[in-house]
């Protein structure tokens, strides 16, 4: 079973990693689209309501997405009907629960909408670990940037963050 809890060094998880776009949409999505086309990226996974909405609104449909349907701006994500399978999971802030991990395992195959009761932020790590080659994982940075991780190039470095997570026990 796989369950992780953020226990220390929260600052490392807030760092804006490799491809960080400090532009508003649609320009931020256009930058990622250019990257995807230039490097023959085959899979895009988004984590977060605003990022997912922007990708869908500006024509760059992710392979699978994870949202919690809560944003500071009260934004509703349109276009989620594109995803054929909906998986609902519980995932408290600072965690990647077993059920959330299992949902990401399924989502990397494509066509999955993960609806999170709690917080989806940490699921970006699960997507980075589990995504197939030629994938990008995109999420929003808390200061307003769009972060896109090309997993082939940065997976090993970013997975060192798991050293700052503790495995957790979940009640059945």
Curated annotation (Swiss-Prot):
GO terms under biological process: coenzyme A biosynthetic process
Pathway this chain belongs to: Cofactor biosynthesis; coenzyme A biosynthesis
Protein name: GTP-dependent dephospho-CoA kinase
UniProt record similarity statement: Belongs to the GTP-dependent DPCK family.
Organism per entry: Pyrobaculum arsenaticum (strain DSM 13514 / JCM 11321 / PZ6)
Record's keyword terms, sorted: Coenzyme A biosynthesis, GTP-binding, Kinase, Nucleotide-binding, Transferase
E.C. number: 2.7.1.237
Ligand binding (GTP): 49-51, 68, 70, 120
InterPro entries: GTP-dep_dephospho-CoA_kin
Keyword match Chloroplast: no
GO molecular function: GTP binding; kinase activity
Known function: Catalyzes the GTP-dependent phosphorylation of the 3'-hydroxyl group of dephosphocoenzyme A to form coenzyme A (CoA).
Catalytic activity: 3'-dephospho-CoA + GTP = GDP + CoA + H(+)
């Amino acid at each position: 079973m796989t369950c992780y809890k953020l226990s220390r060094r929260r600052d490392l998880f807030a760092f804006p990693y490799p491809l960080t776009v400090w532009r508003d949409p649609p320009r931020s999505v256009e930058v990622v689209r250019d990257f995807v086309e230039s490097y023959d990226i085959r899979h895009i996974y988004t984590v977060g309501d605003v990022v997912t909405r922007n990708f869908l609104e500006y024509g760059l449909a992710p392979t699978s997405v994870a949202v919690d349907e809560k944003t500071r701006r009260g934004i509703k994500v349109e276009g989620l009907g594109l995803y054929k399978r909906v998986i609902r999971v519980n995932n408290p802030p600072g965690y990647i629960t077993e059920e959330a991990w299992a949902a990401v395992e399924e989502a990397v195959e494509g066509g999955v909408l993960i609806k999170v009761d709690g917080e989806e932020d940490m699921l970006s790590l699960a997507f980075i670990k589990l995504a197939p080659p030629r994938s990008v994982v995109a999420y929003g940075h808390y200061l307003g940037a769009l972060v896109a991780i090309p997993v082939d190039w940065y997976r090993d470095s970013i997975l060192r963050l798991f050293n700052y997570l503790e495995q957790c026990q979940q009640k059945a």
